[in-house]
């Protein structure tokens, strides 16, 4: 986390807010830790994700020259197609990223192990967390192909941003 903080703190050296923002969004925010989010179940490790999101929020505040309210941060973390700045929050995406990664890897694991699991299941705490985020029951079937499902992404963002459950004030 300290490495990320150090790099983000160097963004102002560029002296071009647009370049700083593009680097923040495209390289230093969620893309920086997406591999970890896909491969590690972070349900019991929310603090580092909150810390990461706080670093990104602080960097955006520095670029804009003003601290962000919780509502402004929620809007900034929406996808650009939904009127946001595309600075996705790690704490929001971690459970779904991990679940979808497990589902995508299952056929490969079955082939490598010579097994054919007819009913693949995800850990119940993971499903419960995702269900709480989107406001409805979640199953392996509803998550299959989720990266292509606009409706699911909409539910994820609507459930999180309209209720402003994340807060994270700074």
Language model segments and positions:
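Nucleic-acid-interacting cores, centered on viral/eukaryotic replication and modification enzymes
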Residues: 1-170
């Amino acid at each position: 986390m300290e490495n990320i903080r150090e790099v983000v703190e160097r963004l102002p050296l560029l002296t071009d807010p647009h370049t700083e923002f593009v680097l923040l969004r495209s390289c230093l925010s969620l893309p920086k830790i997406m591999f970890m989010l896909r491969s590690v179940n972070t349900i019991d490790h929310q603090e580092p994700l909150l810390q990461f999101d706080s670093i990104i929020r602080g960097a955006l505040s520095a670029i804009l020259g003003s601290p962000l309210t919780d509502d402004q941060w929620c809007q900034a973390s929406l996808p650009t197609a939904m009127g946001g700045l595309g600075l996705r929050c790690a704490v929001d995406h971690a459970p779904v990223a991990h679940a979808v990664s497990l589902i995508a890897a299952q056929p490969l694991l079955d082939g490598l192990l010579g097994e054919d699991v007819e009913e693949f299941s995800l850990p119940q705490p993971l499903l419960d967390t995702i269900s709480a985020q989107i406001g409805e029951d979640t199953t392996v079937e509803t998550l299959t192909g989720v990266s292509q499902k606009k409706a699911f992404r909409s539910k994820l963002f609507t459930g999180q941003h309209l209720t402003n459950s994340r807060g994270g004030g700074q």
